[in-house]
Amino acid sequence: MDRRTFLHLPVATAASFALPARAHADGLPRPASVPGGVAVVNLGPQPSPPLARFNGERVLVAGDASGWFAVVGIPLDAKVGAALPLTVERAEREPETIAFAIGRKRYATQQLSVKPEQVELSPADLARHEQERAHLRGVLRTFSESAPDSLLLLQPCEGPRSDSFGKRRFFNRQPRSPHNGLDIAAPDGTPVVAAGTGNVLDVGDYFFSGRTLILDHGRGFLTLYAHLSAIDANTGDRVPAGKRIGSVGATGRVTGPHLHFSVYLNAAAVDPELFIS
């Protein structure tokens, strides 16, 4: 079969490939083909799941023989208007490419004041951060073959959502990376639970994120819980959705107690609110 290329347009005009933007239709996250969003691409029916790749990373494929969907995490730095290629491999067929367009989304900006040494790092702190960043980059590229129990998530702690995903952040008036998670305001010690069933992939105390726990839900679908005051699970533990895994704290680079909650698909941080039921 010849190699084929399709265009996956915004959901309103590409019914043949895009899942309609219904809230959590069929147990899938809300589609949002924007930087930091999720593209849900219809791969059609076949007996076994096809293999999909995006930006060199394996992509989560969900569904069953009656219909498969690629659930693609779109990086925050994706270029608006670009047609990004999703490579799909099916048994006994040549690979095909499905391209989907990236729409525009405007994210707010935020000014934060922190200790000067948390912005201009000392040589020792910079070396520590670079080592931790390399470690976490490898962790966040994890792709395990087990399918997630669910693609819908619980809010992991009680409290108002205080800072949204994607904000362009300035620390002491200096630009830094966009906010790659959702912040939930809560007092120190508030219980934090697993947003979904998964395996504890990584536990650490990092310069910026403080005490941090990462859950692997399967097939490149990960959640991260940061700035914890305490962690109540160990690497390798299997934890069900809703089980306590730690407590809200103010560790790492923070201005006060809160939970920083991130969701990753195919190593890209995506908006957690697309998954919270």
Where are these regions (language model features)?
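Surface-exposed, glycine-biased beta-strand/turn segments
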Residues: 99-209
